């Protein structure tokens, strides 16, 4: 059986401060750095050997991937970065404290923005300091592709081509794959892999630690699912 290991990035500085992060390129906290290292140690203890790895273009996921692979003594494994694995874009909520947003917009509205499958948060202003439209890492993308806000539905729509073009073919080829990504980009792919309904995915949480493992047969049927170390 082939293995797909999802590692959500370790705690970021904005996770720690309870801020909406999205596409803002925020670093790992000290705790998050240790979580990434511990993830790698769990991988090594489980005897999982990777053939390739994928991550986003955001430093918290890139660093988590590198730290985990290093701790697993597999830093040589090829890593491909893609914006399609980025966190969900939180639009105009980016940088806001979650508790303060609830006070401003109401608990129910913020809950809907965060947890619903297809409701979009307010757009991010084009001149916002965190706007991806002026970020050099997205210069090769058509401007119309760069989001100003996303829900989980849109996140899945842009992550799915990467699954179909990169991750799934590697698994079908018998390769073990590491994906260092984000809570919502992982949730989106989990929805697709497990064929969860729009309502079912609302209750799925992906922790910063430990890594989540999926095992597949040669036809890419899901055989088992578990968290390392649990």
UniProtKB/Swiss-Prot annotation:
HAMAP family: PGAM_GpmA. InterPro entries: His_Pase_superF_clade-1, His_PPase_superfam, Phosphogly_mut1. The record marks 182 as: Transition state stabilizer. The gene is gpmA. Substrate binds at residues 8-15, 21-22, 60, 87-90, 98, 114-115, 183-184. Pfam families: His_Phos_1. It is an enzyme of class 5 (isomerase). Pathway: Carbohydrate degradation; glycolysis; pyruvate from D-glyceraldehyde 3-phosphate: step 3/5. It comes from Streptococcus agalactiae serotype V (strain ATCC BAA-611 / 2603 V/R). Its EC number is 5.4.2.11. One of its GO terms (molecular function) is phosphoglycerate mutase activity. The active site is at residues 9, 87. NCBIfam families: pgm_1, PRK14115.1, PRK14117.1. This is 2,3-bisphosphoglycerate-dependent phosphoglycerate mutase. It catalyses: (2R)-2-phosphoglycerate = (2R)-3-phosphoglycerate. It comes from the Bacteria.
């Amino acid at each position: 059986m082939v293995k797909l290991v999802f590692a959500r990035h370790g705690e970021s500085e904005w996770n720690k401060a309870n801020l909406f992060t999205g596409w803002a390129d925020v670093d790992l906290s000290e705790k998050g750095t240790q979580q990434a290292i511990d993830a790698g140690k769990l991988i090594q203890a489980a005897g999982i050997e990777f053939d390739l790895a994928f991550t986003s273009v955001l430093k918290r996921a890139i660093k988590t991937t590198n730290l985990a692979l290093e701790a697993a003594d597999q830093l040589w494994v090829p890593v491909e970065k893609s914006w399609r694995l980025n966190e969900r874009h939180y639009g105009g909520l980016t940088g806001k404290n979650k508790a303060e947003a609830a006070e401003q917009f109401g608990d129910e509205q913020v809950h809907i923005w965060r947890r619903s499958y297809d409701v979009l948060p307010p757009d991010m202003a084009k001149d916002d300091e965190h706007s991806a439209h002026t970020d050099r890492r997205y210069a090769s993308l058509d401007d119309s592709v760069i989001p100003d806000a996303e829900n989980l539905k849109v996140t899945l729509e842009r992550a799915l081509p990467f699954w179909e073009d990169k991750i799934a073919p590697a698994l079908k080829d018998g390769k073990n794959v590491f994906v260092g990504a984000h809570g919502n980009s992982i949730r989106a792919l989990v929805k697709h892999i497990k064929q969860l309904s729009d309502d079912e995915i609302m209750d799925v949480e992906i922790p910063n630690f430990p890594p989540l493992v999926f095992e597949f047969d040669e036809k890419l049927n899901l055989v088992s699912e578990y968290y390392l170390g649990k």
